[in-house]
């Protein structure tokens, strides 16, 4: 899980999700692409 000020989709499988007012990126293909805004 990377914590970044600006989250971006890193591949075509990445999805931007908003949970509890935190923007996250989840990826089905590569778990290393997981990010959250912080």
From Swiss-Prot:
Pfam families referenced in this protein's UniProt entry, alphabetically: Ribosomal_L36
Molecular-function annotations in GO: structural constituent of ribosome
Keywords, ordered alphabetically: Ribonucleoprotein, Ribosomal protein
Single GO cellular component term: ribosome
BP GO terms, sorted: translation
Entries under InterPro entries matching the protein: Ribosomal_bL36, Ribosomal_bL36_sp
Protein family (similarity comment): Belongs to the bacterial ribosomal protein bL36 family.
Protein name, per record: Large ribosomal subunit protein bL36
